[in-house]
Every structure is written in C-alpha cells, then in structure tokens.
C-alpha cells in the first residue's frame, strides 16, 4: 500500500462518498387560470337563461375551469374574479346598465351553483368594449378602416356621438357586418380563478 501511495495511486483506495442534500419544503405557490365566456341574453335583458342559445356550453366552460381547481387535492381555490363587457351598440347609459347587471347575474349564478361565500367572488364591468372594437377594425380589411380608427381615437367626441358617426361613416352594409361579426364578441365575461398549490413535504 505504501508503495502504491508513493506512486500517487493511493487515492484509488479512498472510499468515495456522496453527500445527499435534503431539499427544503416548497412554499405555497399562487396560480391563476383565465378564460372568457360569451353568454347570450335576449335584447336588453339581464337574466341568465342557462338553456338559451349557447349558454349551456358557455356556462359549462366556466364550471369546468372552477371544477379543475376544486377537484385537485393539491390546490385550494382562493378567489374568482369576473369582468363583464357590453358592446358599443346603443346608448352608453343602457350599455352600462347591461354590463353591470349581466356581470352580477353571472356572479349570482356561480355563487348559487357552488354555494360559495359571497366574499369569494369579486367583479367589475366595462360599459363598452372599445378596446376590442378597435382591435377588430384594425385587423380588418374594411374600406374605410383608417377613417373609422381616426374617429375611434378622437377623445373629444361624446361616446354616443362617436358610435353614431362610425355607423354613418361605415355605411349600412359595412355597419351590418360590424353588428353581426364584431359586436357579439364584444359582449363577454372574462373570468380569473385564483388558487394556491400547496408545498410538498419531505416525505413526498
């Protein structure tokens, strides 16, 4: 052995050791999942009819998102936020009424369905989704797109007057296209389901 050590080979006989580092238990992780629902309402109505048009599938989509979180043993539902929007069609005052009350109708539906505490769900509303409207026009190939966008960006115009001028500028056919292809998508309810993922323990 001394002879080997003198030749620099003694290290071969040293026992190798592997150090095992114990991981720290992870802290709680905060997560969120988002979605959008496009509920249908009869004209000027604020009550949700679950069987009306596509409401069955849209409500199921919301429930599926919530259920995914609720049914996972590693997660805890901490809150739900709902943000409702109306389209610019009609007066701003009426659209404010619709956006506010339709948002509340969805809050009431979710609260009632799951028997949630009222404090679990928060909500807000936007009277008219002009941001979505502008994105639609900007991405379109409408003949008077630039003029319509200029009108949209004019902050000096009364909101109702602006909508009327856009309708006049677009013309009957183009405005009909906007009513059918754009406005329905601007009536939406965005929802965020917040939850925590518990940290693992060392046995896991």
Region roles according to the model:
Residues 87-191:
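Periplasmic OmpA-like peptidoglycan-binding domain that tethers envelope proteins to the cell wall
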């Amino acid at each position: 052995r001394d002879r080997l050590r003198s030749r620099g080979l003694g290290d071969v006989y040293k026992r190798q050791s592997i150090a095992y580092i114990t991981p720290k238990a992870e802290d709680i992780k905060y997560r969120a999942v988002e979605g959008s629902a496009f509920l249908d309402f009869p004209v000027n109505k604020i009550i949700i009819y679950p069987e009306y048009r596509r409401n069955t599938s849209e409500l199921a989509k919301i429930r599926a998102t919530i259920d995914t979180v609720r049914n996972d043993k590693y997660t805890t539902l901490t809150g739900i936020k709902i943000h409702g929007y109306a389209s610019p069609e009609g007066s701003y005052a009426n659209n404010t009424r619709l956006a506010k009350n339709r948002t509340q109708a969805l809050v009431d539906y979710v609260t009632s369905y799951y028997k949630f505490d009222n404090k679990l769900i928060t909500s807000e509303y936007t009277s008219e989704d002009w941001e979505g409207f502008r994105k639609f026009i900007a991405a379109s190939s409408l003949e008077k797109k630039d003029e319509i966008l200029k009108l949209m960006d004019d902050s000096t115009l009364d909101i109702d007057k602006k909508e009327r001028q856009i309708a006049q500028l677009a013309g009957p056919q183009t405005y009909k296209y906007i009513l059918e292809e754009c406005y329905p998508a601007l009536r939406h309810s965005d929802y965020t389901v917040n939850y925590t993922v518990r940290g693992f323990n060392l046995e896991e």
